[in-house]
Amino acid sequence: MDESLLRFDKKQKYLVFDTETEGLNLIRSRPWQVAWLVVEGGKILEKHDMFLDWPNLDVSAGAAKITGFTMEEYNKRKESPRKVWEKFSKHLYDEDTFIVGQNLLGFDVYMVNIWRELMKLEADYSYVERIIDTRALAVAIAKDIPVDKDDFISWQYRLINHRERKLKTSQAFLLKKYNI
């Protein structure tokens, strides 16, 4: 077994996150929920599930159905986007932390930028080079595609855009397949 693999580095820190949004528009849909874990050595150091308070939030019927969104729950739990950002961004921009998630490169990085824009912050994608997108990894495993270690981020972008009928890469499928 290759001891240099990330999974053997018990001091490596990971930020695992996901956003829920008003819809699928990569330019305008606002993230209304962000959930994240900070993990080191197999131990969860932090666990958050926070709602962002935006005026006139308009979650599409499809997004509400998929995410279980209700305005009642949202109104109970919503917090200042800046307050949530302060907690979240310290991990996102920590250069010693790898960032992990399903389809982060295809969706969530855009939602993070919308969040920043709504708070009048400049775009900052400096964290993207540290992303490990589990959708890209799932495609690579399913199709037996070797990793491009020299240009890992471009390799992941190519794979998240791979489309093939009956190729299963959802988190639910992967968790079941690998008994996680």
List the model feature ranges, each with a label.
Residues I131-H162:
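Short alpha-helix plus adjacent loop in nuclease-associated cores
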Residues M1-M119, Y125, R165-N179:
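Conserved non-catalytic scaffold segment of RNase H-like nuclease domains
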